[in-house]
Amino acid sequence: MSGSPVKRQRMESALDQLKQFTTVVADTGDFNAIDEYKPQDATTNPSLILAAAQMPAYQELVEEAIAYGKKLGGPQEEQIKNAIDKLFVLFGAEILKKIPGRVSTEVDARLSFDKDAMVARARRIIELYKEAGISKDRILIKLSSTWEGIQAGKELEEQHGIHCNMTLLFSFAQAVACAEAGVTLISPFVGRILDWHVANTDKKSYEPQEDPGVKSVTKIYNYYKKFGYKTIVMGASFRNTGEIKALAGCDFLTISPKLLGELLKDSSKLAPTLSVKAAQTSDLEKIHLDEKAFRWLHNEDQMAVEKLSDGIRKFAADAIKLERMLTERMFSAENGK
């Protein structure tokens, strides 16, 4: 009745095939867009939350966050900060109703060079999840992969049992430092690396296997697997499905709803390109990085230096936009009285 097994297999979507060897994660704050793709986990960031917070469907969450900020009181700045943390957690809690795994919630990018402030803010976010009845085991705290961010991740993991997702990761130096810090997961970016090469070199298009972002994640994956690091490698920031397919077999891949939709409609055959076995044969050598060596090696990578600082600025700008939006909603009525 349902056709031959061969025919059925042939019609299997690229998304379903990908799920056989890679954990698929949805990269969105728009949790209504998650259902049909059935991801294991989800990731958010300040830009995605800002976009979702402006959608009519999510105004109740925004109102709830505002009410929470006001209820805690204190100076206006404090109320806004509390409202934003609450908003991130409300979105995370709604997403968790739709997925079996974990959600990633980001610490304010403006704290990217302040280890202690990142640790404190992360603990506050976990506390808010706890108030909402959600265990820290279902949360990944996202931190910028600066030296300070990586050390904050190490402290959160070792001293507080808080799982971290190191983001804005563009260089091999960042990946090595994260592995040595023993964080739960890293998010090496793919598309933003491609963007830099397209903007700064004469080559304007790449085959997926030659894509500089794909090559970066492949090298990081091979290094982690060759030397037995437990940290999960989650490729992030994709510009097209070709990049995703070229990283099939990576531990996790976090993908926007738009590209998840394209993979769902695509029935071409997909085979893993990354594997632990292949990683063992790579010619990578193990290195150790203290702070000085990290800063030097990272600084040697012009693309990574520019994209890390650009990424922090972009997330910070969107955090400021979100603050302004909430400030207007929280205080303009009062000021207008």
From Swiss-Prot:
InterPro entries per the record?
Aldolase_TIM, TAL/FSA, Transaldolase_1, Transaldolase_AS
Q: Which UniProt keywords apply?
A: Acetylation, Cytoplasm, Nucleus, Pentose shunt, Phosphoprotein, Schiff base, Transferase
Q: Which residues carry this modification: N6-acetyllysine?
A: 115, 219, 269, 286, 321
Q: In which pathway does it act?
A: Carbohydrate degradation; pentose phosphate pathway; D-glyceraldehyde 3-phosphate and beta-D-fructose 6-phosphate from D-ribose 5-phosphate and D-xylulose 5-phosphate (non-oxidative stage): step 2/3
Q: Where in the cell is it found?
A: Nucleus; Cytoplasm
Q: What is its EC number?
A: 2.2.1.2
Q: Where is this motif: Nuclear localization signal?
A: 1-10
- What are this entry's molecular-function GO terms? carbohydrate binding; identical protein binding; monosaccharide binding; transaldolase activity
The role this protein plays is: Catalyzes the rate-limiting step of the non-oxidative phase in the pentose phosphate pathway. Catalyzes the reversible conversion of sedheptulose-7-phosphate and D-glyceraldehyde 3-phosphate into erythrose-4-phosphate and beta-D-fructose 6-phosphate.
What family classification does the UniProt entry report for this protein? Belongs to the transaldolase family. Type 1 subfamily.
NCBIfam families with a match to the protein in the record: PRK12346.1, talAB
PANTHER family per the record? TRANSALDOLASE
Note the HAMAP family from the entry. Answer: Transaldolase_1
Q: What is this protein called?
A: Transaldolase
Source organism per entry reads Rattus norvegicus
Q: Lineage of this protein's species?
A: Eukaryota, Metazoa, Chordata, Craniata, Vertebrata
Chain's gene name: Taldo1
